[in-house]
Amino acid sequence: MGRVIRNQRKGAGSIFTSHTRLRKGAAKLRTLDYAERHGYIRGVVKQIIHDPGRGAPLAKVAFRDPYKYKLREETFIANEGVYTGQFIYAGKKASLNVGNILPLGACPEGTIVSNVEEKVGDRGALGRTSGNYVIIIGHNPDENKTRVKLPSGAKKIISSDARGVIGVVAGGGRIDKPLLKAGRAFHKYKVKRNSWPKTRGVAMNPVDHPHGGGNHQHIGKASTISRGAVSGQKAGLIAARRTGLLRGTQKTAE
């Protein structure tokens, strides 16, 4: 009989440790207040920093506290084109410039925004990773709703009062450059999660994996496996509807 395979050991579970010790903090929009709902408030970009474990850079923006005589520093996801010393305007009456924070209802159709709120006041949930953005498709003023296109291509209807940052998240094209070295992959995953290196099933012995063994590396049987298979067999393409490359052009309904 074979050994307990990797995904069976995973299923038993253990306490997950997320590698967040070096992170610079949560990147969120300002808490929604009177100044943003009715006018605008001005901040200045103090510095742009790298956040370990995140592809996009962060911007430290200092705003004057509307209620106390002090400065409040916020951490935003930096958009492409944002620079230190730049003024950032946040609010309903802010201008339509890169880096400014506006409610979606105040942006014309076709505007490219990022770090968009899913629910009003949640401080940013959609289009937050490097190079990503959300496109405003249309507004419905009667219901105070806005239709947006997400980075996945999916369309979503959200409140027109939900805020977004004008522009594209910085760090685009990051995944186009290959890592090339194991050392770079090591440092990448060291600040993410313990999911690397990952030994291929065909490189194992037959006791360790259903794809293991043989005088050359080959699976030796169909790699698809049924949903009802016992856990020791569940390796490969589980309950696959189809396999192989998609051929021809694909039409997506608008």
UniProtKB/Swiss-Prot annotation:
It comes from the Eukaryota. GO terms for molecular function: RNA binding; structural constituent of ribosome. One of its GO terms (cellular component) is cytosolic large ribosomal subunit. The keyword Oxidoreductase does not apply. The keyword DNA-binding does not apply. It is found in: Cytoplasm. SMART domains: Ribosomal_L2, Ribosomal_L2_C. Pfam families: Ribosomal_L2, Ribosomal_L2_C. One of its GO terms (biological process) is cytoplasmic translation. Keywords: Cytoplasm, Ribonucleoprotein, Ribosomal protein. Component of the large ribosomal subunit. Mature ribosomes consist of a small (40S) and a large (60S) subunit. The 40S subunit contains about 32 different proteins and 1 molecule of RNA (18S). The 60S subunit contains 45 different proteins and 3 molecules of RNA (25S, 5.8S and 5S). Belongs to the universal ribosomal protein uL2 family. Component of the ribosome, a large ribonucleoprotein complex responsible for the synthesis of proteins in the cell. The small ribosomal subunit (SSU) binds messenger RNAs (mRNAs) and translates the encoded message by selecting cognate aminoacyl-transfer RNA (tRNA) molecules. The large subunit (LSU) contains the ribosomal catalytic site termed the peptidyl transferase center (PTC), which catalyzes the formation of peptide bonds, thereby polymerizing the amino acids delivered by tRNAs into a polypeptide chain. This is Large ribosomal subunit protein uL2.
